[in-house]
Curated annotation (Swiss-Prot):
Keywords: Acetylation, Nucleus, Phosphoprotein, Transcription, Transcription regulation. The lineage of its organism: Eukaryota, Metazoa, Chordata, Craniata, Vertebrata. It is found in: Nucleus. The keyword Transcription applies. May be involved in transcriptional regulation. Pfam families: BEX. The gene is TCEAL4. GO terms for cellular component: nucleus. This is Transcription elongation factor A protein-like 4. The modification N-acetylmethionine is found at residue 1. Residues 1-125 are annotated as: Disordered. The modification Phosphoserine is found at residues 88, 96. Belongs to the TFS-II family. TFA subfamily. Residues 25-96 have a biased composition (Basic and acidic residues). Coiled coil: none annotated.
Length: 209
């Protein structure tokens, strides 16, 4: 009798274990389903339903034993925090997405001329000489004393000299580049460097033997 009783207890305990093992699996399945639903809701942007599902999970957890309830409460709190963080990020995204729509509306109201990039508008064919000429004309309209007028004209003359010098430097630089490309480039008597070098003789200059 004792053996049968012990066996019955063993069977009952085994059945209890099996039920306990089956319950977590069944409990996990709704969580997986909830996560899939949450993903769908995230894609649709429905944050209100997320709060409802969290409340439903809390109600389900209260009906379960205390040991399981405590474990689930920790999980639900973590999930709730992650949902709150995710919801705040998602709420920020629609606002940022709404801005391009307002820009497109504003662009639709603007005339076609304003569609040209700003940098393209700023580019002009006016050179430094043109600007200096305009500045000379504008100086007469300004209320400058004679000394100030002289200073301004001196500054303009300096600018023109610097421009001319920079052009000369660029010309010399280009000349040097051409010499580097062709080491046998003909040089005049003033360009002798490090000894006497005869100018380059082309094929036509060589006498026929």
């Amino acid at each position: 009798m004792e053996k049968l009783y012990n066996e019955n207890e063993g069977m009952a305990s085994n059945q209890g274990k099996m039920e306990n093992e089956e319950q977590p699996q069944d409990e996990r399945k709704p969580e997986v389903a909830c996560t899939l639903e949450d993903k769908k809701l995230e894609n649709e942007g429905k944050t209100e339903n997320k709060g409802k599902t969290g409340d439903e999970e809390m109600l389900k957890d209260k009906g379960k034993p205390e040991s399981e309830g405590k474990a689930k409460e920790g999980k639900s709190e973590r999930e709730g925090e992650s949902e709150m963080e995710g919801g705040s990020e998602r709420e920020g995204k629609p606002e940022s997405e709404g801005e391009p729509g307002s820009e497109t509306r504003a662009a639709g109201k603007r005339p076609a001329e304003d569609d040209v990039p700003r940098k393209a508008k700023r580019k002009t064919n006016k050179g430094l000489a043109h600007y200096l000429k305009e500045y000379k004309e504008a100086i007469h309209d300004m209320n400058f004393s004679n000394e100030d007028m002289i200073r301004e004209f001196d500054n303009m003359a300096k600018v023109q000299d610097e421009k001319r010098k920079s052009k000369q430097k660029l010309g010399a630089f280009l000349w040097m580049q051409r010499n580097l490309q062709d080491p046998f480039y003909p040089r005049g008597p003033r360009e002798f460097r490090g000894g006497c070098r005869a100018p380059r003789r082309d094929i036509e200059d060589i006498p026929y033997v």
